[in-house]
Amino acid sequence: MAFKFNAEVRSAQGKGASRRLRHNGQIPAIVYGGNEDAVSIVLNHDELNNAQAHDSFYSEVITLVINGKEVAVKVQAMQRHPFKPKLVHIDFKRA
């Protein structure tokens, strides 16, 4: 199963900005690795939450469309809420 998500670069950093994103149904994430700088992004929470239910989400290469540019990544780390079925943050590593 091929996964493809639309993402936007986020400029606001910090705890307050991340909480506002989560309250609006989005999830903060970061893309790093390769020869490029790390990029902070924001994704739709519901799309990612549904996709992460599949086992292949963790092993396959995922395509992120960041401002019109496709980036191939793999999930490096994922933080979940302690008792709610919500994602808190995701780290992606360029494939």
Curated annotation (Swiss-Prot):
Keywords attached to this Swiss-Prot or TrEMBL record, sorted alphabetically, are: Ribonucleoprotein, Ribosomal protein, RNA-binding, rRNA-binding
One Pfam family from the record? Ribosomal_L25p
Query: What's an example of a GO molecular-function annotation for this chain?
Result: structural constituent of ribosome
Query: Is this entry keyworded Ribonucleoprotein?
Result: yes
Coiled-coil blocks: none
Q: Name one GO cellular component term.
A: cytosolic large ribosomal subunit
InterPro entries to which the protein is assigned, alphabetical: Rbsml_bL25/Gln-tRNA_synth_N, Ribosomal_bL25/Gln-tRNA_synth, Ribosomal_bL25_short, Ribosomal_L25_dom, Ribosomal_uL5_bac-type
Q: Which GO terms describe its biological process?
A: translation
Family membership = Belongs to the bacterial ribosomal protein bL25 family.
Instruction: State the HAMAP family in the record.
Output: Ribosomal_bL25
Q: Which PANTHER family match?
A: RIBOSOMAL PROTEIN L25/GLN-TRNA SYNTHETASE, ANTI-CODON-BINDING DOMAIN-CONTAINING PROTEIN, RIBOSOMAL PROTEIN L25_GLN-TRNA SYNTHETASE, ANTI-CODON-BINDING DOMAIN-CONTAINING PROTEIN
Quaternary organization? Part of the 50S ribosomal subunit; part of the 5S rRNA/L5/L18/L25 subcomplex. Contacts the 5S rRNA. Binds to the 5S rRNA independently of L5 and L18.
Known role: This is one of the proteins that binds to the 5S RNA in the ribosome where it forms part of the central protuberance.
Question: What is the name of this protein?
Answer: Large ribosomal subunit protein bL25
Naturally occurring in which organism (per UniProt): Mannheimia succiniciproducens (strain KCTC 0769BP / MBEL55E)
